[in-house]
Amino acid sequence: MLIMPVIVLFYKENGLSMQDIMLLQALYSLALVIFEVPSGYFSDTIGRRNSLVAGSILCTFGFFIYSLSYSFSGFLCAEMILGFGYSFISGTDSALLYDTLLEAEKEKDFTRKQGRLSATANFSEAAAGILGGIIAVSSLRLNFYIETGIIALSIPVALSIVEPKTHKNLKPKITYKGFCNIIRETFSDPPLFWLIACNAVILASTLTIVWFVQPYLEISGIPLIMFGIIWTVLNLSVGAASLSADKLKNILGNKFSFILPVILIITGYFSLSFMNLKWAFALFILLYIARGYTLPVFTNRINLQIPSERRATVLSIRVLLTRLIFCIVGPVSGYISDCFSLRTGLLFAGTSFLLLGTISLAGLLKYQNRLK
């Protein structure tokens, strides 16, 4: 995305504080929390393709509103639409990939394929980072105009998708009882619940750090044009971690493949809170590696526990928990950053993720032998 390397600067240019920025993102997360699981159920019942088309249209409209907005209220309206739109996409994309591989009897390749998909997305974002940084020198808003056009291209792509027979043949019906049953079964299954919970904590921590990178670079005196280059390197590290996730998981084994990302995020946050600014870039890379490694590894293990007719809904529950955690940690850490310092905000976030990570990891390790 062209906007991400400089989005915090864009917010500040339009009068938002760090607390405002974190609150805005928390409200976006709240929109995802509200719509995420119902839209996942929509994907499981109406179809993956239809869900992706709806999400693409809504996201295009959301970015269009963003490009015309100049205040917190305008940005909030855009974020609500984007939250609604993205809820149709998140979970559905991974479910579509897994069901396609399942139909071809290649589901064992999911971690590698998901890693490649994540890597491709991050390599694309890395390239966009350089371009976004260059464009931002002339105008921060211009990135939003161009981004709207790029997102619009996803609509014809979504329309061209062929639904896998694995899902088409199921033809489940939309019922409130069926929806509630999936929720209840997920939360009453300890191995699956703790797997999702641990993954959600890790993803929430890597989501939170994204909003600290640009302010950290700003107080370090980094030139604006370098923001895009740094963003590019960070996304390349995510892509590289995603590509190597399958091999690294096989080397580490199941237990340590769960422990590694938790160690990385805790080390990264606390080191950023106490160490010299010159080491910040290496520490950000550490956290971004955790992000790239986690998605394919945990998503594969979650997929192994659930049937196709529940897949998108359960994967959406993971996103719901991720955003719920961010809704709490994000705004509070932003408020602390405004009132005290950026490092103090990072320390609060790190302490929160240490506590949540330890609890969820302990639960996961307790039940790991019952996972498929």
Predicted regions and their residues:
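Juxtamembrane intracellular "pre-TM" segments in multi-pass secondary transporters
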Residues: V162-A197
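Cytoplasmic helix-loop-helix junction between adjacent transmembrane helices
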Residues: M80-N122
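Helix-loop boundary and gating motifs at the non-cytosolic
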Residues: M1-I34, D189-T232
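C-terminal transmembrane helical hairpin of 12-TM major facilitator-type secondary transporters
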Residues: K255-F298
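C-terminal ends and interior cores of transmembrane alpha-helices
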Residues: I57-Y70, F75, I263-N276
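Helix-to-loop junctions at the C-terminal end of transmembrane segments
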Residues: I34-G47, A136, A240-N254, S337-D338
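Helix-loop junctions on the cytosolic side of multi-pass membrane transporters
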Residues: L140-N143, E147-I174, A362-K372
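Conserved MFS/SLC helix-loop-helix module at the cytosolic interface between two early adjacent transmembrane helices
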Residues: V33-Y70
